[in-house]
């Protein structure tokens, strides 16, 4: 299995093997097999670049608009969740591809060609794709039966996509690891493995530990000026799902999702279906919940993070749904969690 492409390089699983009174070696081996199988399957399901024999994946759905496809329950649930949340950003596939080109550029002049804020053609394209993405008559998902998905795409959008050479209408892009971490976590938990924590390099965490016997840590960083500063560590008990919205590059998966111009201007992956451009309300926002997975937590808070600025009132509303927030104002930590616990960094 080790040689097969999988999504595990983006994630770290830490597990307290042997704690349940069974052989540590045997438990580690069994857990490793389950986890690796899930990592291979997850990689395939959410892939937009190629097809695989054993699954119907996102690539297949993109290649067969207006056809009913039967998909794995994991992908069905992910698409249904995004659709139910009315998160139209899933339909910005062509603009995510363009953003990747921008972020992989070697210099500002090359990057600017893909930037709707700096290039007329790019601006025109962003506006066109956003207009299609906003309109359910142009693109939408239907779920006609159990694990069945149909991606409806209008003739007008198909013609435009063909003219522009697009290959993917649908792409989870920066949201993908939230759905993958939930799948990995739910898979091992379903097999009875609960004394573990999975984290992704781009800031998602699923802590499965329900014992309440162990304290876990999550680092708090804040971009102040052009310097990312450590502000200490949030302490928490499981189970928890943590989502980290950030307007700067934080981990290795971010290299092809963020770009910093020489003047300090950042481009981020948080594109909005309203105009096809990136929007961030603050340099960072951490949201977490003991009730929901990462995907639900992300979808509940995403629109708040895309606002002009963070609204304490809206974040309080989230807290009433048991989704808590941590953010910064004037370099001071703010939170909606009455039980928030953290250890400050020694300055």
Model-derived features: positions:
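Mature catalytic core of soluble alpha/beta enzymes
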Residues: 1-347
């Amino acid at each position: 299995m080790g040689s097969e492409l999988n999504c595990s390089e983006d994630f770290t699983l830490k597990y307290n093997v042997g704690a349940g009174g069974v052989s540590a070696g045997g438990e580690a081996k069994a857990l490793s097999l389950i986890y690796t199988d899930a990592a291979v399957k997850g990689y395939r399901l959410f892939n937009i670049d190629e097809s695989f024999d054993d699954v119907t994946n996102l690539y297949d759905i993109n290649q067969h608009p207006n056809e009913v496809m039967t998909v794995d329950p994991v992908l069905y649930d992910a698409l249904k969740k995004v659709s139910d949340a009315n998160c139209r950003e899933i339909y910005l596939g062509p603009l995510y591809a363009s953003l990747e080109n921008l972020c992989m550029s070697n210099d500002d002049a090359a990057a600017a060609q893909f930037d709707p804020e700096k290039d007329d053609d790019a601006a025109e394209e962003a506006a066109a794709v956003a207009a299609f993405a906003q309109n359910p008559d142009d693109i939408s998902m239907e779920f006609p039966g159990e694990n069945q998905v149909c991606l409806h795409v209008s003739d007008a959008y198909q013609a435009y996509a063909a003219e522009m050479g697009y290959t993917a209408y649908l792409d989870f892009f920066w949201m993908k690891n939230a759905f993958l971490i939930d799948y990995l976590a739910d898979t091992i938990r379903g097999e009875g493995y609960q004394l573990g924590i999975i984290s992704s390099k781009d800031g998602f965490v699923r802590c499965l530990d329900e014992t309440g016997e162990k304290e876990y840590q999550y680092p708090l960083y804040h971009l102040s000026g052009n310097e990312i500063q450590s502000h200490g560590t949030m302490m928490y008990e499981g189970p928890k799902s943590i989502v980290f919205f950030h307007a700067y590059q934080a981990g290795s998966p971010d290299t092809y999702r963020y770009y910093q111009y020489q003047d300090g201007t950042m481009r981020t992956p948080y594109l909005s279906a309203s105009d096809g451009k990136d929007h961030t309300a603050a340099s960072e926002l951490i949201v977490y919940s003991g009730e929901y997975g990462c995907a639900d937590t992300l979808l509940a808070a995403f629109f708040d993070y895309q606002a002009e600025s963070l609204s304490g009132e809206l974040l309080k509303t989230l807290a009433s749904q048991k989704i808590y927030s941590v953010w910064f104002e004037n370099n001071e930590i703010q939170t909606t969690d009455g039980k928030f616990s953290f250890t400050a960094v020694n300055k």
